[in-house]
């Protein structure tokens, strides 16, 4: 057999062929570990994830080698094409012979190509294709049997697994008629009888760890990403563009007639103060005020400039808040699965506490939002989310006086609607602690 190792396309194809052989070794090792995984300290889930990661790496290397194979073929054809249209001196004799024999396309005929090389390439390509197809079926029915039994797709791309891959760990447990504590107790008792408690503990630990990390990452994204995007949008796009358009492309100064009226009131106040200063200076100090009109003019221009900046800020803040809401809505839609996981994790974390701690955290959250000291917190919160309005005390007072009332009604409905059905003892403890808190506040007010 001729030495084809120096041909670049054949070298890439051979590399993909060797990786395909390595895939078969990984599958054999997985089947051997699967039979003895419960008798060793290694978890079956870790073996599954390790095998899946190794297979995905092999698939990526195979596709990368096949891509190199196609690129090498393309460059070989390109070099052959350029060689026949601009041949070296040593190839002119061969080109003349090919034209004499009647090859009008000026290319190498197929009978001059080694048939053994073609058969070898076709055999390896067929073997790689069969290996990848068999790997997809094997992953579906052996590596992830639970996903195939439910009739769900493992992934959108059958080989690369780049989208929609379902993990072997179930990250969300739906709430049914029976409480999950009862079903888990039955599962643990069954695992103890079958001597499978260790894999069950590892599974629950992996479930809790994945839920916590996923929930914290999602909450961090909900807090940071909309704020960063809206801030960058305001600083580098909306405010400079709106300021340029407002000052150069249109002649209006005031955004609304109310701003014009306020500016006139300020100018009148400035004139009255200036006249008062002039009268005081002439009557008591005996001095003549110089440049009174210039001072009034400068202060008037400063007042108009401030109103102009307020109008620009209103438009810029409105666009920024719209971008913030769009980004936040996009995160909610794109992270629907993460939202379900976060909901499940929060429920598990809350229901795992004692009744006293549950009532304590409920009181802490309600007092922070609707307690006697909450208006200061709401004033700070409304100053961050302005909804296009410039900071105004009347708007903040209106928000503080209405939104906590609505939130208080919703919280009371949730407490009496859900907690009474799930755990009446929590409601009783909550009422007791709430009465003690109210009694303490009344005594404090009487002493004052």
Swiss-Prot record:
<feature type="transmembrane region" description="Helical">
    <location>
        <begin position="314"/>
        <end position="334"/>
    </location>
</feature>
<keyword id="KW-0472">Membrane</keyword>
<dbReference type="GO" id="GO:0015297">
    <property type="term" value="F:antiporter activity"/>
</dbReference>
<keyword id="KW-1133">Transmembrane helix</keyword>
<keyword id="KW-0633">Potassium transport</keyword>
<dbReference type="GO" id="GO:0042170">
    <property type="term" value="C:plastid membrane"/>
</dbReference>
<dbReference type="InterPro" id="IPR004282">
    <property type="entry name" value="CemA"/>
</dbReference>
<protein>
    <recommendedName>
        <fullName>Potassium/proton antiporter CemA</fullName>
    </recommendedName>
</protein>
<feature type="transmembrane region" description="Helical">
    <location>
        <begin position="395"/>
        <end position="415"/>
    </location>
</feature>
<keyword id="KW-0375">Hydrogen ion transport</keyword>
<comment type="function">
    <text>May be involved in proton extrusion.</text>
</comment>
<feature type="transmembrane region" description="Helical">
    <location>
        <begin position="47"/>
        <end position="67"/>
    </location>
</feature>
<keyword id="KW-0934">Plastid</keyword>
<comment type="similarity">
    <text>Belongs to the CemA family.</text>
</comment>
<dbReference type="Pfam" id="PF03040">
    <property type="entry name" value="CemA"/>
</dbReference>
<keyword id="KW-0813">Transport</keyword>
<keyword id="KW-0630">Potassium</keyword>
<dbReference type="GO" id="GO:0006813">
    <property type="term" value="P:potassium ion transport"/>
</dbReference>
<keyword id="KW-0406">Ion transport</keyword>
<keyword id="KW-0050">Antiport</keyword>
<dbReference type="GO" id="GO:1902600">
    <property type="term" value="P:proton transmembrane transport"/>
</dbReference>
<feature type="transmembrane region" description="Helical">
    <location>
        <begin position="213"/>
        <end position="233"/>
    </location>
</feature>
<keyword id="KW-0812">Transmembrane</keyword>
């Amino acid at each position: 057999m001729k030495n084809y190792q120096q041909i670049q396309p054949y070298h890439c194809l051979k590399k993909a062929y060797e990786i395909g052989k390595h895939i078969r070794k990984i599958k054999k090792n997985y089947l051997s570990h699967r039979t003895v995984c419960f008798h060793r300290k290694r978890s079956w889930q870790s073996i599954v994830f390790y095998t899946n990661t190794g297979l995905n790496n092999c698939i990526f290397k195979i596709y990368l080698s096949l891509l190199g194979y196609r690129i090498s073929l393309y460059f070989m054809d390109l070099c052959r094409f350029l060689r026949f249209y601009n041949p070296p001196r040593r190839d002119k004799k061969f080109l003349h012979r090919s034209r004499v024999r009647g090859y009008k396309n000026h290319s190498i005929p197929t009978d001059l190509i080694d048939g053994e090389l073609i058969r070898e390439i076709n055999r390896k390509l067929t073997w790689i294709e069969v290996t990848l197809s068999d790997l997809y079926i094997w992953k579906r029915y052996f590596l992830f049997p639970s996903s195939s039994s439910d009739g769900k797709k493992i992934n959108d791309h059958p080989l690369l697994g780049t989208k929609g891959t379902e993990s072997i760990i179930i990250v969300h447990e739906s709430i049914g008629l029976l409480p999950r504590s009862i079903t888990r107790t039955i599962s643990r008792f069954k695992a103890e009888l079958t001597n499978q408690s260790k894999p069950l503990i590892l599974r629950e630990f992996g479930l809790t760890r994945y839920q916590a990390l996923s929930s914290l990452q999602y909450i961090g994204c909900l807090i940071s990403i909309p704020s960063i995007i809206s801030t960058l949008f305001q600083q580098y796009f909306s405010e400079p563009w709106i300021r340029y358009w407002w000052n150069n492309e249109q002649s209006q100064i005031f955004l609304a007639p109310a701003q014009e009226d306020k500016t006139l009131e300020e100018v009148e106040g400035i004139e009255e103060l200036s006249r008062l200063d002039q009268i005081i200076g002439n009557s008591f100090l005996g001095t003549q005020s110089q440049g009174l009109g210039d001072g009034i003019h400068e202060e008037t221009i400063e007042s108009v400039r401030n109103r102009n900046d307020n109008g620009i800020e209103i438009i810029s803040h409105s666009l920024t808040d719209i971008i913030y809401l769009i980004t936040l809505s996009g995160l909610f839609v794109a992270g629907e699965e993460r939202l379900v996981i976060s909901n499940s994790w929060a429920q598990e974390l809350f229901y795992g506490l004692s009744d006293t701690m549950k009532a304590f955290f409920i009181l802490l959250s309600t007092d922070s939002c609707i307690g006697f000291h909450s208006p200061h917190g709401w004033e700070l919160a409304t100053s961050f989310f302005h909804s296009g309005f410039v900071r105004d005390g009347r708007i903040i007072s209106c928000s503080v006086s209405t939104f906590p009332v609505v939130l208080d009604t919703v919280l009371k409905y949730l407490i009496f609607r859900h907690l009474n059905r799930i755990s009446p003892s929590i409601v009783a403890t909550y009422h007791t602690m709430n009465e003690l808190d109210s009694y303490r506040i009344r005594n404090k007010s009487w002493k004052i």
